[in-house]
């Protein structure tokens, strides 16, 4: 029946397979089965998330987030005390995330020596030990330099192990993944006007960078290269998320319709 077909989609099958695997492994460990037969189960391929499931910040939310880190708006008194000591660091972290779509570990592993400002580039340490030189734009160069020059602790105060680490905690150690994640959650939650626990992860800022680049007009293959996606189908998810963008642009790019911005300008 249709009901049976519906219930046996790949997600349902994966759940059922998991339950059976647990049962058979239990029986095997207890000597009730001679062989562990779960090794012969065929893998079940689960579908990639649908485009409408992609969560990211909208442009106005990015603007709000950057305003928060700039001015401290929306922070509690306790958060503001902390922010006064880390605002340049926090700003540099957020700007790098939304510009380059860095993975959490890629940002965490950045060193001062990763940056060559005279050549206008910096080194990213990708997955699987891959190193990639990336051009640094003016905004990113400015926020990173401001942090290094005006807020980062002096070398004499930093332990040998963390001398080269770019982003340091107040304890003068390389920031942990958790502290970076909490930082991003805090600022994004204020931007989205939600509770701190519902703030976004660094991966959502990666999604924000990808969709924003595609909206700006960069090709899927350019974005794939910048984001280091293994497969272009991953990048296409972000493009599909904004599938109506071209229609919106074209409808607004209308010289003859008096209700569009261009039409109004022409008739002024």
What are these regions (language model features)?
Residues 1-268:
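Conserved catalytic core of the tyrosine transesterase superfamily
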């Amino acid at each position: 029946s249709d009901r049976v077909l519906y219930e046996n989609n790949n997600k349902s099958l994966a759940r059922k397979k998991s339950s059976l695997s647990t049962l058979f492994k239990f029986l095997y460990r207890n000597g009730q089965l001679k062989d562990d037969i779960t090794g012969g189960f065929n893998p079940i391929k689960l579908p990639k998330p649908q485009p409408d499931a992609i969560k990211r910040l909208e442009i106005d939310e990015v603007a709000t987030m950057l305003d928060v880190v700039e001015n401290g708006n929306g922070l509690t008194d306790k958060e503001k005390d902390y922010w006064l000591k880390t605002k340049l660091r926090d700003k540099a972290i957020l700007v790098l995330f939304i510009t380059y779509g860095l993975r959490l570990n890629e940002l965490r592993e950045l060193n001062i020596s990763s940056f060559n400002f005279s050549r206008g580039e910096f080194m990213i340490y990708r997955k699987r030990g891959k190193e990639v030189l990336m051009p640094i734009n003016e905004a990113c160069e400015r926020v990173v330099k401001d942090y290094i020059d005006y807020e980062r602790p002096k070398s004499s105060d930093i332990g040998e192990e963390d001398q080269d680490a770019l982003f340091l905690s107040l304890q003068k150690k390389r920031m942990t993944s958790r502290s970076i994640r909490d930082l991003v959650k805090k600022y994004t939650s204020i931007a989205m006007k939600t509770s701190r626990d519902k703030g976004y992860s660094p991966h959502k800022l990666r999604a924000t960078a990808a969709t924003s680049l595609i909206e700006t007009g960069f090709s899927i293959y350019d974005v794939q290269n910048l984001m280091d996606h293994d497969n272009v189908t991953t990048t296409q998810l972000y493009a599909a998320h904004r599938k109506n963008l071209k229609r919106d642009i074209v409808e607004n790019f209308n010289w003859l319709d008096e209700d569009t911005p261009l039409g109004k300008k022409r008739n002024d």
